[in-house]
Amino acid sequence: MLRLALVLAVAAGALCGEPVFSHKTHAPLKIACANCHAGAEVKERAGFPAAAQCQGCHKDWSAKIPSQRVYKVRDFVFFSHVAHKAKTACADCHGDMWQQATVSLFRPVTMIACVECHKEKKATEVCNSCHELGQ
């Protein structure tokens, strides 16, 4: 379900945005984050599912899903899901997605928010671990 929505958005040319999708609608199905965002725990970026996986439930659905960019860090900032997964739960940054009708960021992607979290988790505060030097 979620997978089909994501794939359709990508197929519709939404490569730089996230589909406008209600996780809350699918909450009763108790789908794990990693079922649709494959690789988020082991790769730099969260993955999107293949259409074939979504079509297990959405066999006849051909609607185009509108897209909007939700998360964007500056070009000189590095963010890796795999580096954060060891000490951070998905909900720490994304909130309880199953209660959200639209995709939003629970914790802002700002230097202040990142530094506060790094201090809480006793993570590195070395600038070049997240920033490209010279920027």
Positions of the model-derived regions?
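Sec-dependent N-terminal signal peptides
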Residues: 2-13
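Short sequence/structural segments immediately N-terminal
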Residues: 13-135
